[in-house]
Amino acid sequence: MSKTYVGSRVRQLRNERGFSQAALAQMLEISPSYLNQIEHDVRPLTVAVLLRITEVFGVDATFFASQDDTRLVAELREVTLDRDLDIAIDPHEVAEMVSAHPGLACAVVNLHRRYRITTAQLAAATEERFSDGSGRGSITMPHEEVRDYFYQRQNYLHALDTAAEDLTAQMRMHHGDLARELTRRLTEVHGVRINKRIDLGDTVLHRYDPATNTLEISSHLSPGQQVFKMAAELAYLEFGDLIDAMVTDGKFTSAESRTLARLGLANYFAAATVLPYRQFHDVAENFRYDVERLSAFYSVSYETIAHRLSTLQRPSMRGVPFTFVRVDRAGNMSKRQSATGFHFSSSGGTCPLWNVYETFANPGKILVQIAQMPDGRNYLWVARTVELRAARYGQPGKTFAIGLGCELRHAHRLVYSEGLDLSGDPNTAATPIGAGCRVCERDNCPQRAFPALGRALDLDEHRSTVSPYLVKQL
């Protein structure tokens, strides 16, 4: 760390807190000129200064590690591979730009995303000219905006998390179970009437009517699911102003995005209420992040536990930084949140060599995989299917695969690492995976479905190869 140049990150923290260089220099007990040199990468960040910065700002030292840029580097690299732009940029130049100017790199990625969406909408509008379609829509997909909101905050929302934790502690002073205390809070404090219904229909799990102050919950939900729905509605009633402020801070571009963000924040609050941070963090560490054991201990679903684990990034009490995904049999990724720099392609598709997809052939079984991304970084992935059974005959159920991954350097904290070689030795068998065929740079992958963007193909009509799209070697 003695030769680490992270001026842009120090400048980012200072600007976010509204400190002047002189004020921050005084807090760090260094001269303003020294701080100015650090911010402009003239001088490196020493261990002593790093420790003082982490104390002043309450951030983990890993905030200054280059690994935190992984996703942004991959996203910017994906932009440069766009054939429409017709540019050729060396990957090292991309990494240098992200390191020196992360804000500018993020702006380029966001502009390209809007360009791509606008192009798609223009094509759709052209097709709709002879139909009743208007071709209108938000410049950004609502779910993408909300997903990026959580990612930019490392999937941890301190104000909402601590509010839920404090409320849970207050309610449990009565020494009752959480379901009873949530019911008491809703009925006695907010005057809500709670009805358990069996006739809400196949598509409705719960419904709250503000006009009548009535909360209807499907009897088909498990006790844990019913508690979660009550906690989510309590979020609006107790902390509606906080949620509104957080949505405003997110600067969402459409009403749909704002509504989806409010829903996501309410669900975050519910998870933080059912699984309060400090206790859950301590139990998770004690159980070595055994998801099934935690699920049994808290009487909530495997998916709920896995998702909550991906939010344990409180600066003073960090858990393992996880990436959480949920996919279906067709490869659709319906949920993805990350406290790490793990990159998902925006060009479509993921990787068939990833163990998340193998779980559908082994329903209910935990599968563990050491996987290596094209940049050489190794991850430990834990995957299992979850099934939401139908409430009646003839109604289709739902089956998903849940993936939980972390960088290999954190894997020793997980029970799933037992018996695995965590040395990262190049000779150790790690499955080579990628973010998706269109952006994956592995030249000879036998599972490649599409050629990589921006790469010239080495085609020969008189030759057959394992990989259908060999790349020309320069």
Swiss-Prot record:
One of its GO terms (biological process) is response to hypoxia. Transmembrane segments: none annotated. GO terms for molecular function: DNA binding; DNA-binding transcription factor activity. InterPro entries: Bact_TransReg_Diox, Cro/C1-type_HTH, HTH_RamB, IrrE_HExxH, Lambda_DNA-bd_dom_sf, ScfR_C. Disruption phenotype: Cells lacking this gene show an expression level of icl higher than wild-type during incubation with glucose while remaining approximately at the same level than wild-type during incubation with acetate. ramB expression levels are found to be higher in the deletion mutant than in the wild-type during incubation with acetate or glucose. Residues 21-40 bind DNA. Induction: RamB represses its own expression (independently of the available carbon source) and is negatively regulated by PrpR. CDD domains: HTH_XRE (cd00093). SUPFAM superfamilies: lambda repressor-like DNA-binding domains. Pfam families: HTH_3, Peptidase_M78, ScfRs. Keywords: DNA-binding, Repressor, Transcription, Transcription regulation. Coiled coil: none annotated. SMART domains: HTH_XRE. One of its GO terms (cellular component) is plasma membrane. Residues 10-64 form the HTH cro/C1-type domain. NCBIfam families: Reg_Aceta_RamB (NF038139). Involved in the control of the glyoxylate cycle. RamB negatively controls the expression of icl expression during growth on acetate as the sole carbon source. Does not regulate the expression of other genes involved in acetate metabolism. Was identified as a high-confidence drug target. Belongs to the short-chain fatty acyl-CoA assimilation regulator (ScfR) family. This is HTH-type transcriptional regulator RamB. It comes from Mycobacterium tuberculosis (strain ATCC 25618 / H37Rv). The gene is ramB.
